[in-house]
From Swiss-Prot:
The modification Phosphothreonine is found at residue 222. This is Methylosome subunit pICln. It comes from Rattus norvegicus. InterPro entries: ICln, ICln/Lot5/Saf5, PH-like_dom_sf. The modification N-acetylserine is found at residue 2. Residues 134-158 are annotated as: Disordered. Its main location: cytoplasm. The modification Phosphoserine is found at residues 95, 143, 192, 194, 197, 209.
Length: 236
């Protein structure tokens, strides 16, 4: 096929993990011949006896697995799915309508590597896993990034950026207006009365029911006594 090219086989400089001779390559059901499969850290390559072959970049490989299902293929093999077109079908002309229909369809090619020694399949699969792990999907990395607003350091140094201001509790109090402080004191008083009322309900309040109680801001209680207010609706 036209996409087969001549190139030197991967070596130690490419991080060669496994070299499997007598391996047949099949692309989308069409046999490419028998050659040597090279599983290296940099790429996956296959070369036939004449030195012609192809290489696959790991970021384009979406799936690899050992297939032992005779209904899928008569021989056990290493299955590799690639998000790209290869061979003559990659050069087929498309009409405008075909191009529109294919905009949302990602190209896919299926490779099958069939070694004469089927016992080598596990080693081939393991080498593929190790090399694939060295090339994580960029989209997966982007999804782990923080998606909030970014602080532009350069803009700030030039006096063009705004820095969000954060205060501690004490610093926040110092920035309150007189009206704001009065409102805060009123809210704290209401909270204190609410907590006091809650723990004097039914005339029961024990030292064990309170770990800390300072200005009505931090309270921890023991579980409700069985039979008392278990069916009460409480708005928080």
């Amino acid at each position: 096929m036209s996409f087969l090219k001549s190139f030197p086989p991967p070596g130690s400089a490419d991080g060669l993990r496994l070299q499997q001779p007598d391996t047949e390559a099949v692309l989308n059901g069409k046999g490419l011949g028998t050659g040597t499969l090279y599983i290296a850290e940099s790429r996956l390559s296959w070369l036939d006896g004449s030195g012609l072959g192809f290489s696959l970049e790991y970021p384009t490989i979406s799936l690899h697995a050992v297939s032992r299902d005779p209904n899928a293929y008569p021989q056990e093999h290493l299955y590799v799915m690639v998000n790209a077109r290869f061979g003559e079908e990659s050069k087929e002309p498309f009409s405008d309508e075909d191009e529109d229909d294919n905009d949302d369809v990602e190209p896919i090619s299926e490779f099958r590597f069939v070694p004469s020694d089927k016992s080598a399949l596990e080693a081939m699969f393991t080498a593929m896993c190790e090399c694939q792990a060295l090339h994580p999907d960029p989209e997966d990395e982007d999804s782990d990034d923080y998606d909030g607003e970014e602080y532009d350091v350069e803009a700030h140094e030039q006096g063009q950026g705004d820095i969000p201001t954060f205060y501690t509790y004490e610093e926040g109090l110092s920035h309150l207006t007189a009206e704001g402080q009065a409102t805060l004191e009123r809210l704290e008083g209401m909270l204190s009365q609410s907590v006091s009322s809650q723990y004097n309900m039914a005339g029961v309040r024990t030292e064990d029911s309170v770990r800390t109680y300072e200005d009505g801001m931090e309270v921890e209680t023991t579980p409700t006594v069985a039979g008392q207010f278990e069916d009460a609706d409480v708005d928080h």
